[in-house]
Amino acid sequence: MKVYALVGKSGTGKSHHSMWVARENNIDYIIDDGLLVSDNQIIAGKSAKREPTKVASVRRAIFSDKIHQDEVKKAITDYNIQSLLIIGTSERMANKIADAIGVSPIEKFIYCLLYTSDAADD
């Protein structure tokens, strides 16, 4: 499996630009905030954005929960995923996610340096 990571600070537009990055790199699946997504459809996982606290949100996004990990691992196997884009705020976070869901090491990091109007608020 080819594993890529899109990394950048909060508010840099990672989620917004992920579809373009995936298309440009022939990537069919994306891990974003605890979800495995393909063609804008949720395949597996639970959204970190629905967690009640920032700590819970981060834990969800990095797949700290074994049941959450196993659900996404199973989907990766069942769908025979050949390429995956992991979205994270840092290389360290992306590597933690890759390790938690049991995928190959990340072979390419793509950096999101674009700032949206929300970035100024962070």
Predicted region positions:
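Structural recognition of the conserved hydrophobic beta-strand(s) that form the central parallel beta-sheet
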Residues: 84-89
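Conserved small/polar residues in nucleotide/adenosyl-binding loops
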Residues: 115-122
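ATP-dependent NMP and nucleoside kinases share a basic, alpha-helical "lid"
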Residues: 92-113
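Glycine-rich phosphate-binding P-loop
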Residues: 4-21
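Post-Walker A helix-loop "phosphate-sensing" segment adjacent to the P-loop in P-loop NTPases
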Residues: 23-31
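Conserved nucleotide-sensing/catalytic segment adjacent to the nucleotide-binding pocket
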Residues: 30-79
